[in-house]
Amino acid sequence: MADQRMDISSTISDFMSPDPADLISSSLSTSGVDCNRKRKGSSTDYQLDGFPFEEGMDTDKDDQHGRLDYADQQGRIKNAREAHSQIEKRRRDKMNSFIDELASLVPTCNAMSRKLDKLTVLRMAVQHMKTLRGATNPYTEANYKPAFLSDDELKHLILRAADGFLFVVGCDRGKILFVSESVFKILNYSQNDLIGQSLFDYLHPKDIAKVKEQLSSSDTAPRERLIDAKTGLPVKTDITPGPSRLCSGARRSFFCRMKCNRPSVKVEDKDFPSTCSKKKADRKSFCTIHSTGYLKSWPPTKMGLDEDNEPDNEGCNLSCLVAIGRLHPHVVPQPVNGEIRVKPTEYVSRHAIDGKFVFVDQRATAILAYLPQELLGTSCYEYFHQDDIGHLAECHRQVLQTREKITTNCYKFKIKDGSFITLRSRWFSFMNPWTKEVEYIVSTNTVVSTSVLDSGDAAFPQLAASPHSMDSVLQAGEGGPKRSHPTVPGIPGGTRAGAGKIGRMIAEEIMEIHRIRGSSPSSCGSSPLNITSTPPPDTSSPGSKKILNGGTPDISSAGLLSGQIQDSSGYPYSDNSSILGENSHIGIDMIDNDQGSSSPSNDEAAMAVIMSLLEADAGLGGPVDFSDLPWPL
């Protein structure tokens, strides 16, 4: 037992106290492990008792692996960039191909002589889509209607509401493709008479160009100008307008004159004294039509037309104008009761000093039924009623002599259908500030309703009927007895042939008065239309018409010619007579009539005084001595 205990104790002691050599070897092995954990940057070789190890070799391997990883990463980034560039390039190429395809589909882009930028192509494409919207919009199609209405019933309702006729005209040649039966009520032509005919054959010659412009307007001339995004300059187009490029769905509204198939009346040639009367009679065969509609395109198969004779169309759609024509009213309806205050129906016109129209407001068409170009160049006296010419001629004289506004009484004016409408005008003259001459007369013409005339309003005085007023004016101007004026066939009564020369006579009369005033010594330096000087006392007997030999005519208030009246401005005008009439001319013959006071000495003295006056007026002489005159001043 004791031996066993000794063996166990020795074993434990050996275990608890190891051999020094074992301790050294274990410590070296532990230190070797620690040396391996030093930083990679060291290149020193450690060697202890036959145990060498190298740290530098491990760090070189790590650096090599790091460089390889960096190169691989850079390669991957480069490959990714190249792949992105290829993707972007393919996207740009695809977009450019789509832009080119879109440009080939848009007519305005396809016809350009140079390549357009992308923004311009897109802008043109958007504009082209807007022009095509009218053809695809269901609200503009004929099938947009209630289900319980048939096509014929809808057509009759539209024509009844519009009070006109429906027509379809081809835009290429103006051929009438369809017209409704209601055209007979307006133009007195049947449906079969117009279908297949050219619209231009039934238009007024002056309106053909306007209608052609309405039919040929296309999307090649848009309202807004296209601007190149790169250069900033407007894009020029070389497109030739064609039927396939018309703006389908574009609205149209215009006025034109069309022939009316009125019953012909056989009139012998002897009834027409001149060709002018024939022209006036032919002018009444046209009526003003207001056409409103839109352009429309149909495939030729839908129209059922034969295209064998149309090789130029190349299978394109047929472009037409679908419109409703309504007879344009010439008189605006007036309110029945005078209680409602409305804007007066009026128009403005401008006349030359002889009364001829030089400008007419467009509102005159709705009142008189004349187009402005029909009135230009004609005299206003041709449209006045013969009972009102005397009063209007007097107003004409006053407006040429004064600067004030002249308001006429109510008078009758002939409209296009031959009847008369009651007007009241306000006239004033425009004077050139440099030449002091009247340039033109401005007239504001207001329509007077029948209810106002019947009420006898004092603000609208009426003229008393005087059948011989025009004859008196013509007789005074011509200086002869009254002559009979034949009535022209085809022109309604109420006006006289030759009335247009009244305005010319009045203009010549006023010009003669201005000339006499301008040549008078007492009127030098003053305007012929603004004479307010006080006349010298008249020593001759009242009512005397004779002028002393060698003297100058004294046109003052005390020495006026017979039948003349002096207005508020001191300017004389005649009452229903002309200053250029018979026994009223001022000339050498009238001066020579006074033989009692004529002698060579008196003539020489008068001539000397006149020459002195001229020299004094020109600043060439001294004061004038009037003591040598043979008559008292």
Swiss-Prot record:
InterPro entries in alphabetical order: bHLH_dom (IPR011598), Circadian_TF (IPR050933), HLH_DNA-bd_sf (IPR036638), Nuc_translocat (IPR001067), PAC (IPR001610), PAS (IPR000014), PAS-like_dom_sf (IPR035965), PAS_fold (IPR013767)
Coiled-coil ranges (or none): none
Record-listed Phosphoserine modification sites: S17, S85, S97
SMART domains: HLH, PAC, PAS
Polar residues: compositionally biased ranges: 24-33, 563-578
Example of a GO MF term: protein dimerization activity
Residues with PTM N6-acetyllysine: K545
Disulfide bond entries: none
Any one biological process term the GO annotation gives: positive regulation of DNA-templated transcription
Keyword Phosphoprotein: yes
Entry keywords, A to Z: Acetylation, Activator, Biological rhythms, Cytoplasm, DNA-binding, Isopeptide bond, Nucleus, Phosphoprotein, Repeat, Transcription, Transcription regulation, Ubl conjugation
Triggers of expression: Exhibits circadian rhythm expression in the pineal gland. Maximum levels between ZT13 and ZT16 during light/dark cycle. Similar expression in constant darkness. Expression in the retinal photoreceptor cells oscillates in a circadian manner.
Motif (Nuclear export signal 2) on chain: 368-376
Subcellular location: Nucleus; Cytoplasm; Nucleus, PML body
Residue ranges occupied by any PAS domain in the UniProt entry: 150-222, 333-403
Pfam families for the chain: HLH, PAS, PAS_11
Function: Transcriptional activator which forms a core component of the circadian clock. The circadian clock, an internal time-keeping system, regulates various physiological processes through the generation of approximately 24 hour circadian rhythms in gene expression, which are translated into rhythms in metabolism and behavior. It is derived from the Latin roots 'circa' (about) and 'diem' (day) and acts as an important regulator of a wide array of physiological functions including metabolism, sleep, body temperature, blood pressure, endocrine, immune, cardiovascular, and renal function.
Family annotation (NCBIfam families): sensory_box
PANTHER family xref list: CIRCADIAN PROTEIN CLOCK/ARNT/BMAL/PAS
Assembly notes: Component of the circadian clock oscillator which includes the CRY1/2 proteins, CLOCK or NPAS2, BMAL1 or BMAL2, CSNK1D and/or CSNK1E, TIMELESS and the PER1/2/3 proteins. Forms a heterodimer with CLOCK. The CLOCK-BMAL1 heterodimer is required for E-box-dependent transactivation, for CLOCK nuclear translocation and degradation, and, for phosphorylation of both CLOCK and BMAL1. Interacts with PER1, PER2, CRY1 and CRY2 and this interaction requires a translocation to the nucleus. Interaction of the CLOCK-BMAL1 heterodimer with PER or CRY inhibits transcription activation. Interacts with NPAS2.
Protein's name in the database: Basic helix-loop-helix ARNT-like protein 1
Organism: Gallus gallus
